[in-house]
């Protein structure tokens, strides 16, 4: 009885739109003619879609791996040092900036002008001062995806650090002290005590980052608009749905994105329930 309003709200604003999206994915661009699996065949054979899948995989590996690794390293290194609060505040600060705001900031960092012209972009100013030619960080296909990925790493390393820092501080001091008495060095303590004892938190942070990366859109949209081979699944979905007005293909891409995210969410929920039972 008490959860009925919440269930009604969930049905109206989550379940019904999801079912409608799945339904539209089996129709043509105008949602008039049933086309079966044609849109799904398109999604897994179209060159642009395959590029988007490849880019999302690249984001998934690099952003998740580097953000979590850096967050863990920083959490361990600054633990219990005098300037811990200041260091953590500075590293966490980018989290206060929206994706769009961060993209605008980094546009100035990556700004490019032809060789011989004064460089207003911070990165190209450094490059040219060292005697090299300026680089079109957002237009050269060999580097533009990595340039975009760096933005999200900058944004979310602080998030990973804060969560993992709390887990590191939760390790009993007597366990660490006993290990030191037994002759364990810092490296052994890190791999044999710290990592095993915060493994559940590491998994939660990693899966959370996976979900965030799969949904990435703002950075790509603001920085490149998905051009020059930087398309990702979410940006392609927006283009098909709103730019090209192809509701069938747009819905299909949305369903695929949902199918990629839901298993990760379910894994997180199950892990949370398992931890609750242990408490």
UniProtKB/Swiss-Prot annotation:
Q: What are the TM regions of this chain, as residue ranges?
A: 7-27, 58-78, 90-110, 120-140, 146-166, 202-222, 247-267
Source species, domain of life:
Bacteria
Q: Where is the ABC transmembrane type-1 domain?
A: 53-270
Q: Name one Pfam family in it.
A: BPD_transp_1
What happens without the gene?
A: Inactivation of the gene results in loss of the ability to take up glucosylglycerol and sucrose, as well as to accumulate exogenous trehalose. Insertion causes leakage of glucosylglycerol from the cells into the medium.
The membrane-topology field of this record reads:
Multi-pass membrane protein
Q: Does the keyword Transcription regulation apply?
A: no
The record ties this protein, via PROSITE patterns, to: ABC_TM1
Q: What induces it?
A: Expression is very low in cells grown in basal medium but increases significantly after a salt shock.
Give the multimer and partner information.
Answer: The complex is composed of two ATP-binding proteins (GgtA), two transmembrane proteins (GgtC and GgtD) and a solute-binding protein (GgtB).
Give the family, as the similarity comment puts it.
Belongs to the binding-protein-dependent transport system permease family.
Please state what the protein is called: Osmoprotective compounds uptake permease protein GgtC
Q: Which organism is it from?
A: Synechocystis sp. (strain ATCC 27184 / PCC 6803 / Kazusa)
Read off the lineage from the record: Bacteria, Bacillati, Cyanobacteriota, Cyanophyceae, Synechococcales
Name the gene that codes for it.
ggtC
């Amino acid at each position: 009885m008490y959860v009925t309003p919440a269930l009604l709200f969930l049905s109206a604003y989550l379940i019904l739109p999801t079912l409608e999206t799945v339904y539209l994915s089996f129709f043509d661009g105008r949602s008039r003619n049933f086309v079966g699996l044609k849109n799904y065949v398109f999604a897994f054979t179209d060159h642009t879609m395959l590029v988007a899948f490849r880019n999302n995989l690249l984001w998934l590996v690099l952003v998740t791996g580097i953000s979590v690794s850096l967050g863990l390293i920083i959490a361990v290194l600054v633990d219990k040092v005098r300037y811990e609060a200041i260091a953590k505040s500075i590293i966490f600060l980018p989290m206060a900036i929206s994706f769009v705001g961060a993209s605008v900031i980094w546009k100035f960092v990556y700004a490019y002008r032809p060789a011989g012209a004064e460089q207003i972009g911070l990165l190209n100013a450094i490059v040219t001062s060292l005697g090299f030619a300026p680089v079109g960080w957002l237009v050269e296909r060999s580097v533009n995806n990595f340039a975009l990925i760096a933005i999200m790493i900058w944004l979310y390393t602080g998030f990973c650090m804060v969560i993992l820092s709390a887990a590191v501080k939760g390790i009993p001091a007597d366990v660490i002290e006993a290990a030191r008495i037994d002759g364990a060095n810092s490296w052994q303590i890190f791999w044999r005590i710290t990592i095993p004892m915060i493994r559940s938190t590491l998994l939660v942070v990693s899966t959370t980052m996976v979900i965030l990366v799969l949904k990435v859109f703002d950075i790509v949209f603001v920085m490149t608009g998905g051009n020059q081979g930087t398309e990702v699944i979410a940006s392609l979905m927006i283009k098909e749905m709103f730019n090209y007005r192809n509701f069938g293909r747009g819905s299909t891409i949305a369903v695929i994105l949902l199918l990629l995210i839901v298993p990760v969410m379910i894994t997180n929920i199950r892990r949370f329930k398992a931890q609750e039972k242990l408490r």
